[in-house]
């Protein structure tokens, strides 16, 4: 049986198919960012209160450096559909879901992980049949990290460095899969 939760987030009606995990306290952050047209925008991040100070500081530094992030909206604006949010290149944090292919809650379900410019920094894993699973599927042109293209997160990137300074782990450094968009604590 599904639980339906209604929440008002800065005037937006957010409907989630599941409640947040027990003991998780979520916070709503308004952050400034520079979009791909070079214009300042205000984004909304739903995150675990335990990382809200870190995220506030990181996004302030990214904003000061004019680091481009296309959009930052709650996943509820995409019907809580992670693939749809990633295809729109939406940077988001909290999303109540399990780790792909398991029953374990993801760090996103705890509000402890954030995905940055996910279209250009896809999650890539090899399936048992040897084929690649690319998320978002439209991120296929950005799988080859030896190519040069805009908005790519690497170990030399400011976004990477700021998250590392704040004690986050980067999915792009994982061995089992590569999740270039993903930072978690």
What are these regions (language model features)?
Residues 10-18:
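Hydrophobic h-region of N-terminal signal peptides that target proteins for export
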Residues 99-101, 114-185:
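Catalytic cores and adjacent binding grooves of peptidoglycan-active enzymes
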Residues 18-38, 91, 96-102:
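Cell-wall polysaccharide-cleaving catalytic domain and substrate-binding groove, primarily
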Residues 22-25, 105-111, 164:
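Extracellular/periplasmic catalytic domains that process cell-envelope and extracellular macromolecules
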Residues 25-86:
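Active-site acidic/histidine clusters and adjacent loop/turn architecture
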Residues 1-4:
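Positively charged n-region of N-terminal signal peptides that target proteins for export
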Residues 51-58, 112, 155-159:
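Stable alpha-helical elements in mature extracytoplasmic
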Residues 84-119:
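Mid-length scaffold segments of soluble, non-membrane domains
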């Amino acid at each position: 049986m599904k639980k339906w939760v209604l929440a008002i987030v800065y005037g937006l009606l957010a409907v989630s198919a599941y409640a947040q995990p027990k003991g998780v306290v979520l916070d709503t952050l308004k952050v400034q960012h520079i979009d791909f047209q070079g214009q300042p925008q205000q984004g909304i991040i739903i995150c675990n209160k335990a990382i809200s100070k870190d995220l506030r500081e990181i996004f302030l530094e990214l904003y000061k450096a004019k680091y481009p992030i296309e959009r930052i909206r709650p996943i509820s604006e995409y019907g809580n559909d992670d693939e749809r949010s990633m295809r729109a290149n939406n940077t988001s944090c909290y999303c109540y879901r399990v780790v792909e292919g398991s029953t374990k809650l993801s760090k996103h379900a705890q509000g402890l992980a954030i995905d940055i410019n996910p279209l250009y920094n896809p999650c890539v894993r090899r399936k048992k049949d040897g084929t690649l699973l690319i998320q978002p599927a439209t991120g296929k042109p950005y799988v080859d990290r030896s190519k040069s293209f805009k908005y790519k997160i690497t170990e030399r990137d400011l976004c990477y460095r700021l998250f590392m300074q704040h004690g986050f782990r980067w999915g792009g450094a994982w061995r089992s899969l590569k999740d270039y968009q993903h930072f978690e604590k």
